[in-house]
Amino acid sequence: MARLSAFNFKAWIDEHRHLLKPPVGNKMVYEDADLMVTVVGGPNKRTDYHDDPVEEFFYQLEGDMVLKLYDGEEFYDVPIREGEIFLLPPHMRHSPQRPQEGSVGLVIEAKRPEGAADAIEWYCFNCGNLVHRAELMLTSIVDDLPPVYQAFYASEEARTCGSCGEVHPGKEPPEGWVTL
């Protein structure tokens, strides 16, 4: 067994900073660990909410972000400023928004228990009802998520609210949806 050692995390971030912006936006720190330790960069904007079966730990290293939450009754924002941390409970619908260029955050979550599904949900910007939910067995953020998003964006039927008939905009949120 190889000897274990620490490394300079700030230097690691600087070395991988080119990946922390669109279109990639994130980089796993450890590939073969029981924790998914991910560094995420801004800017990003998204319109989906994630239903994660495990807790997520957020530590905002550089710049600020907003975590949009839906608790089943109310939509609300939790700003996470540079230097702040936040622990998200399992199954709390959340939409991480990092509007600041060059912002960097650390997200830590456990690998999924056997058989535990993640879900991506989109809600109507007009009436707030669920428009579409896609469940998946998440093993790789990079490989597993893009097909889910592409399928939703490509289907007007999937993007049409069953309650009010409004068509979800897909990838682009309405102007002013994210404020710090």
UniProtKB/Swiss-Prot annotation:
InterPro entries: 3hydroanth_dOase, RmlC-like_jellyroll, RmlC_Cupin_sf. Fe cation 2 binds at C124, C127, C161, C164. It comes from the Bacteria. Catalyzes the oxidative ring opening of 3-hydroxyanthranilate to 2-amino-3-carboxymuconate semialdehyde, which spontaneously cyclizes to quinolinate. It comes from Jannaschia sp. (strain CCS1). Keywords: Dioxygenase, Iron, Metal-binding, Oxidoreductase, Pyridine nucleotide biosynthesis. Its EC number is 1.13.11.6. Pfam families: 3-HAO. Binds 2 Fe(2+) ions per subunit. Homodimer. This is 3-hydroxyanthranilate 3,4-dioxygenase. HAMAP family: 3_HAO. It is an enzyme of class 1 (oxidoreductase). Fe cation 1 binds at H50, E56, H94. Substrate binds at E56, R98, E109. Belongs to the 3-HAO family. Transmembrane segments: none annotated.
